[in-house]
Curated annotation (Swiss-Prot):
Similarity annotation: To E.coli YmcA.
Protein name as annotated: Uncharacterized lipoprotein YjbH
Lipid modification (S-diacylglycerol cysteine), residues: C18
Gene: yjbH
Keyword match Membrane: yes
Lipid positions (N-palmitoyl cysteine): C18
Key words of the record: Cell membrane, Lipoprotein, Membrane, Palmitate, Signal
Length: 698
């Protein structure tokens, strides 16, 4: 009887430990040493919240891991990583890389196959070091199941995760080819799926425990790597069990300490934010109160002057115009203040409703961009009046408002406007960065860019920008020779010579913009179009209003700018090329926050092919995207990297500014700059200039 009571008490204690309220809910998945949600050396099937960005640093005697992990979708995790191999030099040539240690770059993906249920675990499949050198490449299938404060994981790994070979590769039963894996190191940037899930396989697993003290979590794992093939050298492994602790300092920071291989300490830090949760915190003028004043059919000059001022400074409409025609009031202007133009429409409607001319039944607000009309928002006055005055509870109606093709009436006697500013000048800070170079891991250039715009007519714009260097560490550049593994024209690999000039004209050009009607827009341009090329070109875009697709075509003839000095950059070399692309834009109906962009055409090196770009927009307006270009240039002719690819993050500056703004800043990462698959960097692209024609993607 006593034994039975003892077992009952033990079972009750376990049940209480697993389900009692003394154990708080886990505060979210944690990052592994390699970046991405996991235990220590091994991954789990868990995913972070959609939009989560984690910046990670881990350090031990042999390696430093720098990684950035983004949860693009609830089912897809992406990770970029640089591994500093502390025991190896970048190269054996001191004049080339000095005493810098070897840096290996990698890209990882993890895909959730299904979510956890009451009985079934969450399951994911993933791959590490895709398109890298193969130093740390691995594939895995992993399952995770929570039980109270414990989260258990069991997985099967190949490659770096499976070198101990503690189980037979199950795929060997399908074909003997899966029993062998080529472990020779590959050329960086090459994507070779032929070795995936090949070679020795190992089981791995572990548990993460949420302690009663919520900031603290403990980890225990069993790993399948034997460290006998590590690039840092054969590493002693006294134990296959690793233990660690993670402490959440704040909502946005974790610190980590672990003891791995039975002989090595690892420590690190994780900084995080969520792109879906970021919100602007600027101070802004309040929306105008609805205080209607009776007006005659023709507005008084003092009244309309006040309206125009409010439209410009409160509603954010630059160059505002007001015009009455029949029973319709027309308002036009360019939204330069609010990223979400709906806010500007709300404010503009209130402004004109407070002093609405007698007899007006409809308000039409047309938004312009670069003097090209984009969209007209048409609102019924009676419906708007009811909404602004307030409707009885239970009797609310839908505002009678719709977006239509831009309507711009001919000038009448009842028209008022604020004179357009034909000239604009501004200075912006510029930070150019390069990560992973041979001379220094981090290269930077801090400078300022002065930009001047002058409208010669309503459609003809002249614009130029001058860059001035303030500080950089480009004195470390000591290698500007052409790539030895490629014979393509050097359309981009002269970048080091260009940026070493302290002052240079970045661009100087003339643009003619025209709204062609029925969803068509066009531009022609000529001059110094970007840092490395000048010439002339044209673009036409067909973008139906609020459609989830669009098509564009651009054609250009350009010559390469000289790079030898700032003065020589105003001259051209003998190299010229015709370049242009047919581009399709698509926002899937099942994923309104995703933009797919596909281009085909001829690139700057004369190669022909296509580019696929996919971008995800989060609730905050942050956009994360990636692209890849394949052309008719062979891998051997292209050189290291095989093809052009990269990722970028575009951040709306109103998340950090003291006031609303439509400006954005972009950060890009390209594993390696080569000459194949390179597009012309045009300052104005019509799809970006017509973003107000879409209610979904801005």
């Amino acid at each position: 009887m006593k034994k039975r009571h003892l077992l009952s008490l033990l079972a009750l204690g376990i049940s209480t430990a697993c389900y009692g309220e003394t154990y708080p809910a886990p505060i979210g998945p944690s990052q592994s040493d390699f970046g991405g949600v996991g235990l220590l050396q091994t991954p789990t099937a868990r995913m972070a919240r959609e939009g989560e960005l984690s910046l990670n640093y881990r350090d031990n005697d042999q390696y430093r891991y720098y990684s950035a992990s983004v949860q693009l979708f609830p089912w897809l995790e992406t990770t970029l990583r640089y591994t500093d191999v502390r025991t190896r030099q970048y190269s054996s040539v001191e004049a080339f890389s000095g005493d810098q240690t070897y840096k290996d770059k990698a890209f990882d993906l993890k895909l959730r196959l299904w979510e956890e249920s009451y009985w079934l675990p969450q399951v994911a499949v993933g791959a590490r070091d895709i398109g890298g050198t193969g130093l740390f490449d691995a594939e895995y299938l992993v399952a995770s199941k929570a039980w109270g404060p414990f989260d258990f994981t069991l997985g099967l790994g190949w490659g770096y995760l499976g070198t101990s070979g503690n189980v037979k590769n199950p795929l060997c039963s399908a074909s003997d080819k899966y029993c062998y894996r080529d472990n020779s190191y590959k050329q960086a940037g090459s994507i070779d799926g032929s070795q995936m899930f090949h070679g020795p396989a190992s089981l791995f697993g572990g548990v993460e425990y949420q302690t009663p003290w919520q900031p603290l979590r403990l980890k225990l794992e069993y790993e399948g790597n034997n460290y006998q093939q590590d690039f840092a050298g054969k590493l002693e492994q006294k134990s296959k069990f690793n233990v660690g602790a993670i402490y959440r300092v704040t909502d946005w920071a974790d610190v980590n300490l672990s003891y791995e291989r039975g002989n090595t300490f690892m420590f690190g830090v994780t900084l995080r934010t969520n792109f879906n949760d970021l919100r602007p915190s600027y101070n802004d003028n309040a929306r105008p109160q609805y205080q209607p004043q009776p007006q005659d059919a023709i507005l008084q000059h003092s009244v309309v002057a006040n309206q125009l001022t409010l439209l410009k400074y409160n509603a954010g409409l630059a160059d505002p115009q007001i015009q009455a025609k029949g029973d319709t009031l027309y308002v036009t202007g360019e939204q330069v203040k609010y990223r979400d133009s709906r806010e500007g429409i709300i404010r503009a409607n209130r402004i004109v409703m407070n002093d609405l001319p007698d007899g007006i039944k409809t308000i039409r607000i047309t938004e312009n961009r670069l003097n090209m009309p984009q969209v007209t928002t048409e609102t019924d006055v009676a419906s708007l009046k009811n909404h602004l005055a307030g409707e009885p509870l239970g009797h609310e109606t839908t505002l009678a408002q719709k977006r239509v093709e831009p309507v711009v009436p001919q000038s009448t006697e009842q028209g008022w406007y604020i004179d357009k500013s034909r000239f604009d000048f501004h200075i912006d800070p510029v930070l150019n960065q390069s990560v992973g170079g041979p001379e220094n891991f981090y290269m930077y250039q801090l400078g300022v860019m002065g930009t001047a715009d002058l409208w010669l007519t309503d459609h003809l714009l002249t614009t130029g920008s001058l860059f001035a260097n303030l500080a950089n560490n480009y004195d470390k550049f000591n290698y500007t020779n052409p790539p030895q593994d490629s014979h393509l024209p050097r359309v981009r690999t002269h970048v080091r010579e260009y940026v070493q000039n302290d002052v240079y004209v970045n661009n100087l050009q003339a643009n003619y913009f025209q709204h062609l009607g029925n969803g068509f827009y066009g531009q022609v341009y000529g001059g110094y179009l970007e840092t490395m090329f000048g010439g002339a070109g044209a673009e036409v875009l067909y973008r139906p209003l609020d459609s989830n697709w669009a098509f564009g075509l651009d054609a250009n003839y350009v010559k390469q700018r000289d790079w030898r000095s700032a003065k020589d950059m105003m001259k051209f070399t003998d190299y010229s090329v015709k370049t242009g692309h047919l581009t399709a834009y698509w926002t899937p109906s099942f994923a309104q926050d995703v933009l797919v962009k596909a281009s085909v055409g001829q690139y700057l090196a004369g190669d022909k092919g296509g580019t696929l770009e996919i971008a995800k927009r989060f609730d905050s307006g942050v956009v994360v995207g990636g692209y890849a270009t394949i052309t008719n240039v062979s891998k051997e002719e292209y050189g290291e990297g095989d093809f052009t690819k990269g990722v970028y993050v575009s951040v709306p500056l109103d998340l950090f500014s003291s006031g609303p703004t439509r400006s954005r800043a972009a950060i890009g990462w390209t594993p390696l700059t080569r000459d194949g698959g390179q597009q012309l960097g045009r300052k104005f692209q019509l799809y970006d200039m017509t973003s107000d024609r879409s209610v979904n993607f801005r």
